[in-house]
Amino acid sequence: MQYLFQIFYRLNSGGNKLYNQEIRNCIFQGNFNTLLKDLARSPDWLNANHLTKEKVETSRFNNEERILRFFAFYYDLDRYKGKLASFLNDFMRNHKDLTENVKNEYASLLSRSLKVAMEIEKLSTSKNVFEAVLIGIAANISALETKGADVINKLYKDVEGDKNFSEEALKEGLGSLEKVQNRINAAKIIFARG
């Protein structure tokens, strides 16, 4: 499969260049790929990201990739080596044929996490911040679902004040192993206080 991805990647030189998730969509067919497309059009995802279905349809699989990143970093952060494309390819390959139960667990985790995230008054639109916050919430979902918006917003302010979310930390090299791990782990720790 890695070779197939490389072939698509190399052939992809004329016209509109395909984004990596567009290539993954072609190669890693299965119910996980279908789930990503469904979740990108779900009311929870649309509301949390201030999107319409029409906007998702024209986003060239950007939303599906963001959801893939959520699952990949949530479940396999320890396998991330700093090479995002191959990490996401591996996660899709290894999860392309989910059982119905696992598929439902994935959908439920994202939906529950988004509902808590929607309590945040001024949630960042930065995909790296949003992703870390969502994973931090997911890691503590049972406790956070019982908290009010005031607690969720206080915890989010703590995230914003953390050095891993400073303007300097979010300037460059956002996909480096150290920065990804630091952001996500900081969000998990902060939201665990809830």
For the regions a protein language model found, what residue spans apply to each?
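Basic- and aromatic-enriched surface patches that contact anionic nucleotides/nucleic acids
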Residues: M1-A85, N89, E145-A149, N153-E160, ...
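Short amphipathic alpha-helix initiation/capping segments at coil-to-helix junctions
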Residues: R60, V102-L110, K122-F130, L144-G148, ...
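Amphipathic alpha-helical interaction surfaces
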Residues: F73-L77, N94, V116, G136-A143
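C-terminal hydrophobic structural anchor segments
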Residues: M118-F165
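Generic detector of solvent-exposed, compositionally biased contiguous segments
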Residues: N33-D44, H50-K53, N101-L123
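Small-residue-rich helix-loop
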Residues: Y80-I120, V129
